[in-house]
């Protein structure tokens, strides 16, 4: 083969080699392009998942806040109802405390020794007794009841002990003497009974 023929064949072989190499290069470029295309797609999918998680967290927080707000409203409503109920139930407390002095005075008047044989004194005595009974019946209708009777067990919630002394016929912590009656308004102490207790 002549040199010229060899030179002509070499470009053909080189061209064949170059063309064989080019598909490899194109393939690598195509793969890189596909990876570049895939990467933004994967990034977008990852971003969507991240945003969905954030949205789910935000929805959960909003749901929690809504439940807390509802609970707070229910608590406020319940407290308001209780306040109104207490206001109705104990609205008479101050008035009742003032009435207790009148009841005490009427009871003292009846406890005072008097000549009941005298008709004028007997009529007055009967009138005071009827007035006291009517007053006690009226206050009882409004939930006011006396507490602290001789013979009851001492209870510090309802009674105030003035003194303790050994007394025959009474067990320890039994009320022996009531110095001033106590009263409850709807089971709430408005005045404790002042008592003497057996030791």
Swiss-Prot record:
Molecular function terms, GO-annotated: adenyl-nucleotide exchange factor activity; protein homodimerization activity; protein-folding chaperone binding; unfolded protein binding
GO BP terms: protein folding
Short name of any one Pfam family annotated for the protein: GrpE
CDD domains linked to this entry: GrpE
GO cellular component annotations of the record: cytosol
Keywords: Chaperone, Cytoplasm, Stress response
Ranges annotated as biased composition (Basic and acidic residues): 1-10
Record's subcellular location: Cytoplasm
Bias-annotated ranges (Low complexity): 29-38
Annotated stretches, region: Disordered: 1-43
Subunit-structure text: Homodimer.
Purpose: Participates actively in the response to hyperosmotic and heat shock by preventing the aggregation of stress-denatured proteins, in association with DnaK and GrpE. It is the nucleotide exchange factor for DnaK and may function as a thermosensor. Unfolded proteins bind initially to DnaJ; upon interaction with the DnaJ-bound protein, DnaK hydrolyzes its bound ATP, resulting in the formation of a stable complex. GrpE releases ADP from DnaK; ATP binding to DnaK triggers the release of the substrate protein, thus completing the reaction cycle.
Annotated family: Belongs to the GrpE family.
UniProt-recorded name of the protein: Protein GrpE
């Amino acid at each position: 083969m002549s040199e010229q023929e060899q030179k002509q064949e070499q470009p053909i072989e080189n061209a064949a080699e170059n063309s064989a190499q080019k598909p490899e290069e194109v393939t690598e470029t195509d793969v890189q392009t596909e990876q570049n295309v895939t990467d933004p797609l994967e990034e977008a999918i990852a971003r969507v998942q991240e945003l969905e998680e954030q949205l789910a967290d935000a929805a959960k927080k909003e749901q929690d806040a809504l439940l807390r707000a509802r609970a707070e409203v229910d608590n406020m409503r319940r407290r308001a109802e209780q306040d109104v109920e207490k206001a109705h139930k104990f609205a008479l407390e101050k008035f009742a405390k003032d009435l207790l002095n009148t009841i005490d005075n009427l009871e003292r008047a009846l406890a005072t020794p008097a000549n009941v044989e005298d008709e004028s004194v007997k009529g007055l005595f009967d009138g005071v007794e009827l007035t006291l009974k009517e007053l006690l019946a009226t206050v009882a209708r409004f939930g006011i009841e006396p507490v602290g009777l001789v013979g009851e067990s001492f209870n510090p919630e309802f009674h105030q002990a003035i003194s303790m002394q050994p007394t025959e016929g009474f067990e320890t912590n039994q009320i022996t003497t009531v110095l001033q009656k106590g009263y409850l308004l709807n089971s709430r102490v408005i005045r404790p009974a002042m008592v003497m207790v057996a030791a």
